[in-house]
Amino acid sequence: MHHQHGEKHHHCVATRRGVVALLAAAAGVHSAMGLRYALAQGAAQGGAQGVAAGPDEWMIDTHHHIYPPRYTRENLKRIVDDSSALPAAAYTSWAPGWAIEQMDKAHVRAAIVSMTSPGIWWNNGDQAREWARECNEFGAAMAKEFPGRFGMFAAIPLPDPEGSMREIAYALDTLKLDGIGLLTSYAGKPLGHSAFASVLDELNRRKAAVFVHPTMSCCGMEIPGISPPAIDFSTDTTRTIASLAFSGTFARCPDIRFIFSHGGGTMPMIVQRVAGQTRNFKPEELARILPNGFTAELKRQYYDIASVALNPGGMAAVLKLVPVSQLFYGSDAPFGTTTAVAGALAAFELPPADIRAIRRDNALRLFPRFAA
């Protein structure tokens, strides 16, 4: 038993070294042969050639996080402070080979990966631009090394409009990534804030898929024994959805395909309470910001079922709010297991076609390149 543990540790170290080589290759300072060799162990053990699954079983995972090594190493204190209640090994030992192993366990054909909280923005635009570029090139190199297994929602320094515009162009036009990943708020500003309008207008022009993941809000409070993300993540998602709706951003940017994490936070449970806030607006204002009504805007957005699928009451609220066509499978790896959400989804009494839609068909409408 001890010997097997040692073998596993050796594999993780070797694969992790491979990721460092991957970053170097992505930056153009390492040979292609070095990149292939570095990730060979992850490919061999992770089954990079494909997933054996029944015709209705394989899935697309749209909520799957990565931890590029230099980013993780140099920002470890920030990551720990943000995620202190989560197992440190999830980010300190993360490697592409491990990710593929987890994907194969749940018949996940492809994962569209993203950065997670705390993200790349710490009130330093130049630093954020550097981290966005490095993380995005890491994801692009990983996708190239494991064809068909990975996509990416690119990181951008959202509070820096000029830097964001440059990184959007590079990520989508040069790296050919699958969309953009945003956090729910930056320095206390939700996504509907006017400071972000120009960047969202550009994403609307590009008809971009935009994955939105929660972060710690500016106004949480500590409860002894309770990890702040357990409550505040869902709340910040709800807050940013409301801000996008009531700022008129949803109406102004109808071509952005927003994907909100964890079934939209607490919004499905309090939707009528939030919808009641329309009484605070004049009719002419509502006609501009919510021409189709509040709930109509929510119904056309997309939501992944990470975490919420493990809560039958929460999942029931999601299914009551939005049609099945708007739901994606998401594992929340490496913090959630790929198999937990898959098992919970299979246990719901939904028609087989609906299960298949959530597993992959809905995602394939937005990301058809993963159909092959």
Listing of model-derived features with the role each one plays in the protein:
Residues 60-64, 111-113, 152-154, 180-182, ...:
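Hydrophobic faces of well-ordered beta-strands that scaffold small-molecule active sites
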Residues 109, 113-247:
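Active-site gating/metal-coordination segments in enzymes
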Residues 65, 215-216, 264, 309, ...:
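Catalytic metal-binding/acid-base residues of hydrolase active sites
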Residues 2-39, 48-58, 62, 68-110, ...:
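Mid-to-C-terminal alpha-helical segments outside catalytic/metal-binding sites
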Residues 234-236, 255, 280-338:
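Active-site-adjacent C-terminal substructures of enzyme catalytic domains
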Residues 68-94, 217-237, 274-301:
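Active-site gating loops and adjacent loop-to-helix segments of metal-dependent hydrolytic enzymes
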Residues 246-257:
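Active-site region of glycoside hydrolase catalytic domains
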Residues 89-93, 120-121, 158-164, 187-194, ...:
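Acidic-and-aromatic substrate-binding clefts and catalytic sites of carbohydrate-active enzymes
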